[in-house]
Regions:
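Single conserved hydrophobic/aromatic residue that forms the stacking wall/gate
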Residues: 1-16
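Post-DEXD/H (motif II) to motif III coupling segment of the RecA-like Helicase ATP-binding lobe
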Residues: 10, 35-39
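A short helix-loop-helix "switch/interaction" segment in the helical subdomain of ASCE P-loop NTPases
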Residues: 19-28, 58-64
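Conserved Helicase C-terminal RecA-like lobe
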Residues: 51-184, 188, 246-252
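Conserved nucleotide-binding/hydrolysis micro-motifs of P-loop NTPases
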Residues: 65-68, 143-144, 177-178, 195-197, ...
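Short, charged, surface-exposed secondary-structure boundary motifs
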Residues: 161-171, 198-206, 229-230
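Conserved RecA-like helicase motor core of SF1/SF2 enzymes
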Residues: 175, 180-214
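A conserved SF2-helicase RecA2
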Residues: 199-202, 209-252
């Protein structure tokens, strides 16, 4: 093996994938690592395999409840929103970015660790827009699945085999569904929320592709006036939505 010179791992953190906690190297210094590890990879692209795909991306905007916008506004101004039993705290920029990311899609995780659905608007928007169509939904936060389940009821599953063998729709967390699976039985891929990772953006939107199906229709559901469009602008340009990007762009 080779010793990599330079502090390439200073931004390594931990990520909770639901089934366990792993080291997250997405913020490692790629410019230092890439020249070392590139020679150990074999790249075989879709073009090399004899086919190329196209992704038709559509962005739809959803009006959230007035109460949702009020919570976001108060959090940005006061850095805390207190309820009768719980509190939403944004005493650091990292927390503010995370809480706004949650709130603008209709859920929030309190300081106690408990999560709550505060707005079903996106869920009903998706249900109404794609009524009668078989869709695959990507969500970001765990509570968002509960929101979608409340809206779709028995028409929603998180089991791929059930999805493939029934008329049910499927909802998967972006980080666990972005690679290694096929959602080709869905007519459309719908994003309830968006991830901060550019890798998640590029990998997950190709889940409908097969050799026979080379054109995919993807829909992004953003809250009007929310944070999602800022995230999209960053990750679609192959840049993670980091704290520094949040600070620079969110108030533009």
């Amino acid at each position: 093996y080779e010793i990599v010179q330079g502090d390439w791992s200073s931004d390594v953190c931990s990520s909770d994938l639901g089934f366990g906690i792993i080291n997250d190297y997405s913020q490692a210094k790629i410019d230092i690592l890439k020249p070392i590890i590139d020679k150990y990879f074999i790249r075989y692209t879709q073009k090399d395999a004899g086919f190329e795909t196209s992704v038709n991306e559509n962005i739809l905007y959803c009006n959230m409840l007035e109460s949702t916008y009020n919570i976001a506004k108060s959090l940005k101004k006061d850095k805390v929103v207190k309820g009768v039993f719980e509190a939403i705290l944004a005493d650091t920029a990292v927390k503010e970015m995370s809480k706004l990311h949650q709130i603008y899609s209709g859920t929030v995780k309190f300081e106690s660790g408990k999560s709550m659905i505060i707005d079903h608007s996106k869920g009903f928007f998706i249900k109404d827009k794609f009524e009668g169509q078989k869709i695959a939904i990507f969500y970001k936060f765990k509570e968002e699945f509960n929101l979608l389940k409340e809206v779709f009821g028995d028409l929603l599953t998180d089991d791929l085999s059930v999805f493939d063998n029934s008329n049910k729709n499927i909802a998967l967390q972006i980080v666990s569904g972005r690679e290694g699976i096929s959602l080709a039985n869905a007519k459309y891929l719908v994003y309830f929320n968006i991830d901060f990772s550019a890798v998640s953006y590029w990998q997950s939107r190709d889940r409908l592709t097969t050799m026979e199906r080379t054109t995919n229709d993807v829909y992004w559901i953003f809250s009007k006036g929310g944070i999602e469009s800022k995230i999209y602008k960053s990750v679609s340009n192959k840049k993670d939505f980091t704290l520094s990007v949040f600070k620079k762009t969110y108030n533009d």
